[in-house]
């Protein structure tokens, strides 16, 4: 069976993780983050690190292999797909996903 690829991007931190989707558009949304969720956001900056440590995986609209999200995810050992272009839109309403940080793919679960 072929996985249902919902989003493609750059595999920025190796590993595979599954979890509920939480879309955060900025720091004002940090309060809705839940532990072990897949964090989906436009991009990250240093103020995002406390939220990033709670994620099972991270998916961003922007960035590359040397972006803040990619570097922090590698340090934390959290799978990441960056530079998707539209994950915050494409994953809106999707309850759960699996992130493959090696292939740069996000699958519907």
Residue ranges and their predicted role:
Residues 7-37, 42-109:
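Acidic, glycine-rich flexible loop/linker segments
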Residues 1-5:
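Long, low-complexity segments enriched in small/aliphatic residues
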């Amino acid at each position: 069976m072929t996985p249902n690829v919902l989003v493609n991007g750059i595999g920025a931190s190796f590993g595979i993780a599954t979890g509920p989707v939480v879309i955060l558009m900025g720091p004002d949304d940090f309060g809705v983050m839940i532990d072990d969720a897949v964090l989906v956001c436009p991009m990250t900056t240093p103020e995002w690190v406390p939220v990033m440590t709670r994620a099972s995986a991270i998916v961003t609209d922007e960035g590359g292999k040397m972006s803040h999200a990619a570097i922090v995810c590698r340090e934390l050992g959290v799978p990441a797909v960056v530079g998707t272009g539209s994950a915050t839109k494409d994953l809106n309403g999707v309850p759960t996903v699996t992130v493959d940080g090696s292939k740069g793919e996000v699958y519907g679960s």
